[in-house]
């Protein structure tokens, strides 16, 4: 935020105009800002100034806050280090977004939960919704899962897995093998995935600093 403050001051001094620094009033549909992000010209931009951030911005080409939120989330180890069919979930997301790969869902019941992220598990909230849908987790159980993911509690995750598999088998939406595969995605997200509210807040700051 300090770099954003300095940018505003510089603009005012250079052009002799008063720049409205109220970041809450910046339009979120400014093409020049999105072009800058999509071109990877993001040095000094919150969350996107690293080489990885610039590279993924050029590949994912976000054009709104929701897509920018996804980009920030798939930069985390949960997606970067989860390898499925020879490539990371990060690259699966990007390739599906760019129509290089077809969007597919491991099970049709996951479509409403994962449709916004091209069938890829990106956010903690999605993991919780999957546990609710597939295994019938109640709010307390879902909150335990959230803490296990957010705080990387391996011992807690092992207990949650046992409960998930038992409840999923009892509910009968998916087979035991399918439940094990689905939970393996959730386990991978334990390596560090974002909750969506956090990621959206970061996306807003990224856009504002790019602006």
Range-by-range predicted roles:
Residues 1-194, 201-210:
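Mg2+-dependent phosphoryl-transfer active-site scaffold
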């Amino acid at each position: 935020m300090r770099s954003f403050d300095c940018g505003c001051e510089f603009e005012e001094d250079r052009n002799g105009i008063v720049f409205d620094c109220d970041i809450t009033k910046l339009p979120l549909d400014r093409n020049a800002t999105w072009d800058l992000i999509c071109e990877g010209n993001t040095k000094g931009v919150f969350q996107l100034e690293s080489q990885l951030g610039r590279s993924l911005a050029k590949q994912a080409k976000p054009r709104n806050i929701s897509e920018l939120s996804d980009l920030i989330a798939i930069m985390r180890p949960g997606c970067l280090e989860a390898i499925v069919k020879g490539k990371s979930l990060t690259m699966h997301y990007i390739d599906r977004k760019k129509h290089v790969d077809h969007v597919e869902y491991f099970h049709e019941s996951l479509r409403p939960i994962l449709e916004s992220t091209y069938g890829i598990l990106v956010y903690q909230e999605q993991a919780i919704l999957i546990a609710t849908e597939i295994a019938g987790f109640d709010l307390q159980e879902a909150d335990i899962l959230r803490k296990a993911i957010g705080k990387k509690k391996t011992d807690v995750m092992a207990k949650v897995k046992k409960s998930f598999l038992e409840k999923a088998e009892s509910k009968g939406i998916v087979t035991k093998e399918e439940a094990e595969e689905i939970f393996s995605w959730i386990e991978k997200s334990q390596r560090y995935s974002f909750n969506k509210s956090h990621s959206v807040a970061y996306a807003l700051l990224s856009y504002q600093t790019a602006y």
